Amino acid sequence: REVFPSLNKLTILSDYKKMSQKRLGLVRTKIEQRIDFDPESLLIGKSNKVKKRKLKPKEFQIFINQDLQRIKNIALKKQIVQYILIHELLHIENEDLITLSKNYNRRKKKKIHINNFEEEVFNRFNRLRKLKGIMQIEKREHLDIAIQKILELINWHKK
C-alpha cells in the first residue's frame, strides 16, 4: 500500500491459480456498463443520443501462477510474487483493464507494455525493497535475468 497510495480505497484480493506457463500473473475485474439516455425523447423521436458509460470497478482479483509455489526458498518466492503483484497493481493504477474492454481501434492506440511501464514496475519494486530494508537492484536487466534463472530452477519452460 505504501508503493501504491492511489489504490487504498479499492478492494484487491490475490490468490494462486492454475494457468498456462506463458503467464506469471493476471488481474481480473467486472466492468459495469451503464447506458444513459432519455427514454421519452428516444421513443417520440426527438433525440437519438445514447451514451454508454463504463464505471470504474472497486474490486479487483490478482491471480499468481500456482506453479510458482514450487520455489522452495520462501524469500525468493516472496520477491518474485511481489514483483508480479507490483506489475498487476500498476495495470490497475493505469486503468488498463477499462481500456482493454473498449473496441479494438481504441485499444491498439494505447500500448500497454511500453518501455516506461516496465521501468515503472522496476522502480516501484525497488521502492518496496528500500522500505523493507533490502538492498536495491541497480539495473532492470539484472532483475529480469535473476527471475529467469529462478524460473529455470523449477523447470518453468519444461513442463
Language-model segments: residues:
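Walker B catalytic acidic pair
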Residues: 88
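Active-site-proximal or metal-binding-adjacent scaffold patches in catalytic folds
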Residues: 1-83, 92-159
